[in-house]
Amino acid sequence: KKLAGFSEEYGLLADFDKEADLMFDLLLINGCVITVDSAHTVYQPGYVAVEKDTIAAIGPMSDLPVLPEAGRVIDLCGHAVLPGLVDAHGHAGHCLIKNLFEYRDDWDDLAEQVYYQCTDTEFWRAEGSLAAAERIKFGITTGVSMVGSTPRIDIIEPVGANLEGSSRVGIRQLSGIGCANGPWPKKARAWNGKEYTESTVTPKMAYRSTEEALKAYNGRHPLETCIVAPGRMGLRPGESAEDNIAHNREMYRLAEEYGVPLHTHAFAGDIQFLYDTT
């Protein structure tokens, strides 16, 4: 008589009785439900039950001899459903410039120049909305983005604008900054409403700006989470081992202190270096 919904692995298990009066806010039925769990469980046909903003239960349609009451029922016959799927890596900014440097080997450097010198808050807000719309188009309602190609660390407004632009479309968005990649120093321009002001960007500015963003934007909106998102953790080329260790430890400290995810790139040897030194 008991139905076990979703997976204990993700803490979303919900048991309920077939004979009880059930009421869900949303019930998706007859879809091909791909759970994205470690067992690669697929229910076809299957259902997904939602209460408020939480997946309450999933399973095969055979577990529902009579449809429970629901505020809304959607028949997804012929469609795939991936409950809980997260687009776990993106770069805020790329949606608006992704075709500009398509055939250039130096596209990453050019993207950094655009992000640091040719953008304002409206750029980041508009890009956040466009990226969110594209994610929704492909059935994804939670996204994670690093703000910039390598994070822009001289100001925090791009983070807030990207979160706002994404959340107003209706998705749950996690965006952030952290230690940026070289070369150093970088040149940045910021729009103050009347003109651009120029500044020189140094690596340790990321410590201050990352923490300021965490303080400013977490708790502002239920669909927005500001995270720690350094461009790379491990052993960055062009920096000493001591500097890398300091960067890595500070990013870890901020994520732990503010209780947010730590999201980054890591390449050959980075994981071992982090394990040995952080």
Where do the PLM segments sit?
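Divalent metal-coordination and catalytic microenvironments
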Residues: 31, 48, 53, 78, ...
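Metal-coordinating catalytic core of metallo-dependent amide/deamination hydrolases
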Residues: 157-278
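N-terminal metal-binding scaffold of metallo-dependent hydrolase/deaminase domains
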Residues: 1-67
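Alpha-helical scaffold segments that flank or form the walls of functional sites
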Residues: 98-172, 206-221
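A generic structural signal for short coil/turn motifs at secondary-structure boundaries
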Residues: 36-38, 151-154, 236-240
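Extracytoplasmic/periplasmic beta-strand context in beta-sandwich domains
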Residues: 45-47, 72, 226
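N-terminal-biased segments
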Residues: 80-99, 103-127, 203-207, 250-270
